[in-house]
Structures are given as C-alpha cells and as structure tokens.
Swiss-Prot record:
Localization, UniProt: Nucleus
Listed name of the protein: Heat shock factor-binding protein 1
GO biological process, any: cellular heat acclimation
Signal peptide interval: none
Subunit details: Homohexamer. Associates with heptad repeats of HSF1 trimers and probably also HSF1 monomers, and with HSP70. Association with HSF1 trimers and HSP70 coincides with attenuation of heat shock response and the conversion of HSF1 trimer to monomer.
Gene3D superfamilies according to UniProt: 1.20.5.430
Keyword Nucleus: yes
One GO cellular component, as annotated: cytosol
C-alpha cells in the first residue's frame, strides 16, 4: 500500500471537519426554524381554543361532563 502524504491527510481532515461543521450549522438552523414554527402553531392553537370557548359562551352553550353539549336554555 502506498504511503499517504501527511499534508494530504491534513488537508482531507480539514475538508471533512469543515464539511461536518457546515452540515451541523445547517441542521441547527433548520432545527431552530422547526421549533419556531411549532411554537407559532402552538400559540395559534391556543388562540383558536380561546376563541371557540368565547364563541360558545356567547352562544349560550355550556360544556357538560361528557362530550355532548346542549344550549343552556334547554337545561332543566
């Protein structure tokens, strides 16, 4: 097997390290974007749930222990 030039090994090592760092940076950027979008989606869902609850209150609908809901005017 032919001997490998130490300079070539150092260059290759440097290139691989640079490539890995670039990949890690891109992965971190994408991860941050995904987490930001998940947080945004969570806030939107919370707002939507609040708006639905407000609309139900305005419409006179009250939640029961079960999943069924009836207007407050029909209660005994």
């Amino acid at each position: 097997m032919a001997e490998t030039d130490p300079k070539t090994v150092q260059d290759l090592t440097s290139v691989v390290q640079t490539l890995l760092q670039q990949m890690q940076d891109k992965f971190q950027t994408m991860s941050d974007q995904i987490i930001g979008r998940i947080d945004d989606m969570s806030s939107r869902i919370d707002d939507l749930e609040k708006n639905i609850a407000d609309l139900m209150t305005q419409a006179g609908v009250e939640e029961l222990d079960s999943e069924n809901k009836i207007p407050a005017t029909q209660k005994s």
